[in-house]
Amino acid sequence: MAKKAMIEREKKRERLVAKYAAKRAELKEIANDESRPMEERFKARLKLAKLPRNSSATRLHNRCQLTGRPHAYYRKLKVSRIALRELGSNGQIPGMVKSSW
């Protein structure tokens, strides 16, 4: 299981991304608009750079909701392969049965 600090850090990043998403999108639109004056675009880039680093969606990493594991993550269920196997074996995922052949 991942350290609690890593899990909390990731949750904090998710909150920051949600908080600054609209402002970030607005500034990016201004900065990438070729029809606007160069000075206005440059100011938008500076404002964008002053936003918190963790407010960028690029810094997010998918982690298992149960264990915090960063690898082998199923996006639909938001759990890792190991947690998925455990939940499936316990019958906690509807429609999922253990396969044998």
Swiss-Prot record:
Entry annotated with the keyword Heme: no
Entry GO MF terms: rRNA binding; structural constituent of ribosome
Cellular component, GO annotation: cytoplasm; small ribosomal subunit
Matches recorded under Pfam families: Ribosomal_S14 (PF00253)
GO biological process, one term: translation
Keywords carried by this UniProt record: Ribonucleoprotein, Ribosomal protein, RNA-binding, rRNA-binding
SUPFAM superfamilies on file: Glucocorticoid receptor-like (DNA-binding domain)
UniProt-listed InterPro entries: Ribosomal_uS14, Ribosomal_uS14_bac/plastid, Ribosomal_uS14_CS
Highest taxon listed in the record's lineage: Bacteria
Entries under Gene3D superfamilies matching the protein: 1.10.287.1480
Family: Belongs to the universal ribosomal protein uS14 family.
Complexes and interactors: Part of the 30S ribosomal subunit. Contacts proteins S3 and S10.
PANTHER family the UniProt entry points to: 30S RIBOSOMAL PROTEIN S14, SMALL RIBOSOMAL SUBUNIT PROTEIN US14M
UniProt function note: Binds 16S rRNA, required for the assembly of 30S particles and may also be responsible for determining the conformation of the 16S rRNA at the A site.
Protein's recorded name: Small ribosomal subunit protein uS14
Organism from which the protein derives: Ruegeria sp. (strain TM1040)
Gene (UniProt): rpsN
